[in-house]
C-alpha cells in the first residue's frame, strides 16, 4: 500500500534520482501529467521534496507510535511495537485503511493521544502535495525571515481552497456524526469520548477508512 499511497510515478522517479539516472523529457511529461502540474520546470525537485516529506512523517509517526505502544503496554516485545507502530503510521499517511489484526484499530477506541496522532497523519497524507509544499515554503519563510519581494509569504489559492474545504467538511462531519449518534452509538459515553469519536470518523470516512467501532453499531436511518 506504500506504492499505491505515494504513487508509482513518485516512487519510481525517486529511485531514478537515487541511481543518478537521467530522467528523459518524455518521463518528465508523464510525471507532470500524473501530478497535474502546469509546467515541467522543477518537477523532479518537487517529487524529491514531497517524497522525503511524506517518508519523514511516516518515520517520525512510526517511531512515536512504536515507543508509545511499548511504554503504554500494548505490546510486550519491541519488535511487535515497532511493527505495529510503523504499520499504523504508514497506513495513515497513505490513507490506505489496511490493518493486520482484522478489526482495524478498535483496541485504541478510547486512546485519545493515539487517535489524534492518526488523524494528523491522515490529514497530512490526504491534503495533497501542493498544499504540503506550500506550507513548507511558508515555514521556511518564517524560520529564515526572508520575505519574497519584501512582503510576507502568501499561500496559493489552491492551498486556501483545499485547507478550508477540509476544515469545513471536518467541522460539518463532526457535528453531524455527534448529533446523529448521540442517542445511539454514543449512548452512555462521556462527552469527551463522543467528541473525539465524532472528529475521528469525520476524518477517516473521507480518506482512510479506519474504524474504532463495529460499523453495525451505527444507526441505519
Task: Mark where each language-model region is.
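Membrane-proximal intracellular helices of multi-pass ion channels
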Residues: 1-221
